[in-house]
Amino acid sequence: MNTIASVTLPHHVHAPRYDRQQLQSRIVHFGFGAFHRAHQALLTDRVLNAQGGDWGICEISLFSGDQLMSQLRAQNHLYTVLEKGADGNQVIIVGAVHECLNAKLDSLAAIIEKFCEPQVAIVSLTITEKGYCIDPATGALDTSNPRIIHDLQTPEEPHSAPGILVEALKRRRERGLTPFTVLSCDNIPDNGHVVKNAVLGMAEKRSPELAGWIKEHVSFPGTMVDRIVPAATDESLVEISQHLGVNDPCAISCEPFIQWVVEDNFVAGRPAWEVAGVQMVNDVLPWEEMKLRMLNGSHSFLAYLGYLSGFAHISDCMQDRAFRHAARTLMLDEQAPTLQIKDVDLTQYADKLIARFANPALKHKTWQIAMDGSQKLPQRMLAGIRIHQGRETDWSLLALGVAGWMRYVSGVDDAGNAIDVRDPLSDKIRELVAGSSSEQRVTALLSLREVFGDDLPDNPHFVQAIEQAWQQIVQFGAHQALLNTLKI
């Protein structure tokens, strides 16, 4: 069967210009998902195209992804990224992946040993918030998580990311090998501290001495990642195959924009990512806040209210004058004033975001962005609301966004159609929705302390604002509620 590794590709396709034989598995990456393929791996590929070198990536997937890994091997670890701009496309073959391992195809033992090879300098992760096994209420390791329970009972055969990292670091220490940097690339706040808490929490349970060694010798840099990467669909794979003249089951489509801000704290070296435009900084937090509130906050706002209004894609929302105006107003009037970042033109940043959201070539589903809202709301909307509450400034669009989430998870859109709600707390949410009338819905959902904390549900101003926004949506529908809030 022909693959991208076995055919002559069209001239417009950008193929690797470096010697892939020189690559070693110096980066081991957990989670060969769409985002990683279009972001960290692609940026590493750019560095290799610019200056060569041996910074190859070994991709790891544990208990799923075996079919994708088999397909990747069949095409010599090459895959395609299609960058879709409003003005045209770029087709890129990424060659930075050197090998891949999967627990089903290979073995857990082989995976753990891979982390222990001397050349491994960085272990990076895109495993989503759930993969870190952290208790969201405390930020500490969740010792009630079934995988963590398993790993503490059988530490040499771990099933969780924290368990595998600790076992690998333990073995490296025993063998006299240098430790590696642990680099979280997930779109979660303070991701360096999240993975550090998970690893140290697991290590403390196993050996306080080992935990002390990890604390002293391993670094956990923070990162801010930004690129819109919709999930692959049959349609997107067919479109890419038309560019290539051959099928690539590992291919992914994305927008042209890409940004990666990384805390420059690596214990065993790193690729020269700055050559690929990566911003290496001392403190990621201001950048992270800017992105989470201005981009992700407005994305979630558009996802809930847009879906309720019958818009399937973010770009569809942006064709609507009210939604476009609301997104920009939310960014600049309600989110920007809460930020600490200096020397960034936030108006220019907002205008770029609006243009990215409006990109008609990207079919980014409102339903996809609406997933896992209980984990996203705290940093995307509630953090900004807390600042406004303290200052007594206006946050009426943020209130509408929170009420939009409540209406969305209630399971019916404005046309009366059922919504397929995907959320880690979906069982709990379903129970609260079923047990409350429309008038009681806000109070019922505010009882989710893991989302709203203890402070907001006890704040009468907050509760009143959300109830008013809820009533607007229930009475008039999401689109008219938006117009009423904007007073247009």
From Swiss-Prot:
Keyword Zinc-finger: no
InterPro entries associated with the record: 6-PGluconate_DH-like_C_sf, 6PGD_dom2, Mannitol_DH, Mannitol_DH/Oxidoreductase, Mannitol_DH_C, Mannitol_DH_CS, Mannitol_DH_N, NAD(P)-bd_dom_sf
Pfam families (UniProt xref): Mannitol_dh, Mannitol_dh_C
Listed GO biological process terms: mannitol metabolic process
Enzyme Commission number: 1.-.-.-
Annotated GO MF terms: oxidoreductase activity, acting on the CH-OH group of donors, NAD or NADP as acceptor
Protein residues bound to NAD(+): 27-38
Keyword Oxidoreductase attributed: yes
Keywords in alphabetical order: NAD, Oxidoreductase
Residue spans crossing the bilayer: none
Family that this chain belongs to: Belongs to the mannitol dehydrogenase family. UxuB subfamily.
NCBIfam families: PRK15037.1
PANTHER family: MANNITOL DEHYDROGENASE 2-RELATED, MANNITOL DEHYDROGENASE DSF1-RELATED
Protein name, entry field: Uncharacterized oxidoreductase YeiQ
Organism: Escherichia coli (strain K12)
